[in-house]
Amino acid sequence: MRMPIIALAGCLSLMSSVNALAGVPGQTVIAGYGAITPIEGAAERPDRKLRYRVLFNVTKAAATPDKINPSLEKVARFLNLLGNDGVRPEQGDVVVIVHGPATPIVTEDRAYATKTGVAANPNLALIEALKKAGVSVRVCSQALIGNKIDPATVGKNVETDVSALTTMATLQLRGWALIPD
């Protein structure tokens, strides 16, 4: 009798480990950002059988530079909505490309202060949380140049692409779904 109980406990432990990797329903992926309200009985829900490859186009600045960019919050909300139904995209399957007026949101504090007059970039903690969740946050090098931002001041959790235009075209041709600003 003791051996079957130990075997059952081992199986349950293994199942919970597998479930943690797959995503657990009700799970918040990005804590503190992208608040959601779970809804029962929705007609359409995230599909655990799909591979979510999504590209977020981030061009708009926040209403004021001391606020978190609402488009970055949208990325967190998307991940939390998926996580609420037990869906976790694979590493790099969610991509954020930042350009246009939003470009300064990817800079370290000193450069952000120079550009905006706000001492600390309120977006850096969210960008770090997104990266930890497997999101690839990128910035357009053409936008850096156009906004007179030194590429060396881009935050450590952000990659620099040749251009947002080519990134968006390439990823869509490879099957990423575009979510506009």
What are these regions (language model features)?
Residues 88-106:
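Acidic helix-start/capping segments at beta-turn-to-alpha-helix junctions
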Residues 25-36, 107-181:
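A cross-taxonomic marker for long C-terminal extensions/tails that follow the last structured domain
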Residues 7-16:
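Bacterial N-terminal signal peptides
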Residues 68-87:
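Histidine-anchored nucleotide/phosphate-binding helix
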Residues 1-5:
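Positively charged n-region of N-terminal signal peptides that target proteins for export
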Residues 17-22:
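Sec/Tat signal peptide C-region and signal peptidase I cleavage site
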Residues 47-65, 107-112:
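Acidic/histidine-rich, surface-exposed loop or edge segments in extracytoplasmic proteins
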Residues 62-73, 117-121:
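Soluble non-cytosolic domains of exported or imported proteins
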